[in-house]
Structure formats: C-alpha cells, structure tokens
Amino acid sequence: MIVTIDGPAGSGKSTTAQRAAARLEYVYLDTGAMYRAVALGFLRAEAPATRSGAEAVLPSLTVDVEYRGDTMQVFLGDDAVTDRIRSAEVGRVVSDISTLAPVREYMVEQQRRIGRAQADRHGGVVLDGRDTGTVVFPKAPVKIFMVADIDERARRRLQEYEAAGEEVTFEEVRAEIEQRDQQDRTRDIAPLRRADDAIVFDTTDCTIAEQVDFVVDRVKAQDGRGT
C-alpha cells in the first residue's frame, strides 16, 4: 500500500504522516526532508540555485534514508543531517532549489526507488510532500491533500524553528510561508496542486490525533494497492 499526503508548508503533513505510518505499521518517507538535504548540499558547496549549480552539485551528492525503529534518518553522503536540514537557513532556499529540473528528476527517481522498496518490505509506506500524489506515485490508492489557514501554518512552523533553537519571529515565518506558497503554486515543474482523486482535509482546527485518525481510517477503508 502506498499512501500520499500532499499540501502546503505547515499544513501538518509530516507529523500526521509519521504517526499514521506508525499506527498502520508502515514506514514513513518524508520527501520534503530529502529535498532539504539537497538544499543543504547546495549551501555547503556554496552553489547557486540554478541549473548550472545543480549540474555541479548533483554528480557528487548522495541523499539516502535509514530507519531506526519508526524514525527516518536522512543522510547526505555519510553525514547524518536529520536535525540540520530543519534550520531556517535551509528553509529559505529549499523552494528555489527544489524547482530545478535536474533536482526534481533526481529526487523523484530516488523517492520512487525508496518508496517501492519500503512498501514491499513493510507492507506499506506513507509519503508526504508537494507532488507525491501527482508526480511520484500518481496511481497511489490513497491520496490526501492537507490544507490549513496560513496563520495556523505559520504558528506551527515557528514552533519547529524554536524547538531547533532558531531565533525568528512569527512575522518572518509567515512571510516565508507566503513566499513558499507562491513559489510552489506557480513553478513550471510539478507545481503544488491537488490530484483529481485526492481527498481534501482542512487541518486548521484539528488536533494531531484527529489528523492521524482521518488518515488511518481512509487507509483501512481502501483495499487496493498502488505503485
């Protein structure tokens, strides 16, 4: 079983996907974290967010994941970067980098490889991102598109930054999310959009437990299997 959860920044995708996967005894693949690892690779190489920058960085870049219990660990080469990719610095550049055609081609290939392998190994995988149900696994049997009010999304993202020790204001985070929304909706390659057969779920007033229940219930009601 392959389950995709897409939506804008701060809509609750990652936490919901991770906990739903644990409830279902599947594994969780955070595609956004993989893009953040690529962005960190660009920053370390001091490469511009351009096609030429991608062509310089990608040949020597290796992004992979490992699972330790229910937790997904992200690696950039041999370096564990799960915590570092959540920095505000990475957040400011990841959207520009993720729109580059060479980056998206590389990442979609990796996400399909890992997703299929983990679904075969564990019986199912839950992915979250922005194009998992439209590009990565367009035939997934369960697709959910999560949305939420922008102020609520900014509040959630601010909490993530504060937990990581970042000093940013609510206004800065809200502006960052507005910019990310615009970039995600208008980019030429794989813009953020709802798949025609995706279920729309507004999480603005929902608790995490309610969000997880929603996903788990939809998966249990679906007997198909998609790749």
From Swiss-Prot:
Its EC number is 2.7.4.25. It catalyses: CMP + ATP = CDP + ADP; dCMP + ATP = dCDP + ADP. Pfam families: Cytidylate_kin (PF02224). Gene3D superfamilies: P-loop containing nucleotide triphosphate hydrolases. GO terms for molecular function: ATP binding; CMP kinase activity; dCMP kinase activity. SUPFAM superfamilies: P-loop containing nucleoside triphosphate hydrolases (SSF52540). HAMAP family: Cytidyl_kinase_type1. Belongs to the cytidylate kinase family. Type 1 subfamily. This is Cytidylate kinase. It comes from Salinibacter ruber (strain DSM 13855 / M31). The lineage of its organism: Bacteria, Pseudomonadati, Rhodothermota, Rhodothermia, Rhodothermales. The gene is cmk.
